[in-house]
UniProtKB/Swiss-Prot annotation:
HAMAP family reported for this sequence: ATP_synth_B_arch
Record key words, sorted: ATP synthesis, Hydrogen ion transport, Ion transport, Transport
Function as written in the Swiss-Prot or TrEMBL entry: Produces ATP from ADP in the presence of a proton gradient across the membrane. The V-type beta chain is a regulatory subunit.
Protein name: V-type ATP synthase beta chain
Amino acid sequence: MKRVYSKIESIVGNVITVMAQNVKYGELAIVRSKDSSSLAEVIKLDRDKVSLQVYNGTIGISTADEVKFLGHPMQVTFSENLLGRIFDGAGNPKDGGPRLEDDLIEIGGPSANPAKRIVPRNMIRTGIPMIDVFNTLVESQKLPIFSVSGEPYNELLIRIALQAEVDLIILGGMGLKNDDYLTFKDYLEKGGALSRTIFFVNTANDPVVESLTVPDISLAVAEKFALQGKKVLVLLTDMTNFADAMKEIAITMEQVPSNRGYPGDLYSQLASRYEKAIDFEGAGSITILAVTTMPGDDITHPVPDNTGYITEGQYYLKGGRIEPFGSLSRLKQMVNGKTRDDHRTIMDAMIKLYASSKESIEKKAMGFNMTEWDEKLIKYSGMFESKLMDLSVNIPLEEALDLGWEILFSCFEPKETGIRTELVEKYWPQKKD
């Protein structure tokens, strides 16, 4: 069977077309020119007409260059030696360390059999009150972080990477600015978390096709570690860059565009990645947190809109804080009844009072007379935002719950909170003499 072809039919953008037989979708090839060689991936099959996306671009490639098909899809090394290392979107070392070429595994495989999934039952502690108390992150959950450009979403991921109580962090960056890449690298090194982290990164200067491989490589490695009993947290940023890379390639391929120019299979492409989140019976788990930026703060944009149908809630980052009203963890009820007996009560009471405070703040801004109750709510709102909502707050769950009681004590009488008497008697702070 012929695997080497010496004629390229056409070159359009970063896509080349070759007439070849017995080639599979997703198969890798090497394009050899006079001065260099580049990896390429089969992205379209039309009988014997094969289209390949060239990773390093087509500059310097001519129609007389050689294309050699490798007979397998993208692969990545799997071993404990990955820990503490940084790689690009093709799995090549980016940290100056040695190449790892043993124990190769294929990426982009199917999600695990649903019959092997177990009901989520364990909390992942992060030290961030707006997550731990109000929208608990659950092991094997898949959650996006919706945000607009300019919000500290990467800083939030760094905090989670440093503090999350998991065995292993896999960080996947797509279309990262070089400054953001260096920030991740520096904080992970200084915080001592790099030793339990594997970092796959595609920067804005790297080939756009690598944005598509970063989630697949990250999740393939995560699945192997999970099957070995590891509790793995996969952090991805930014899934909108991933979707934009899909859009760019689809335009090059002259595919019929769907909503706002994105390809028609955007939903299934996103779902195939998010559905990798799983808790294996008798083994480990994969939990996915993925930043999704919203152009113009538009929740109806195709990427966040499709994502919302796939995931189990979302964290909504706005004004430098995790917004309680736009955020939701649909699995929190699976675990927040097992933490402390006042967890759900504090969560519900504080959010209800915070919602009421917004009405009082609006009344004050419009010049209405303030009642004593309005003044209490406004005071409470300020304390809640500064002591619990601020992303710089870093305390364990139990301390956050105690702090919640302190805030309520500072602003209200027990009967004004709507909390059950038995919990008030157990947790309400005592007045100091």
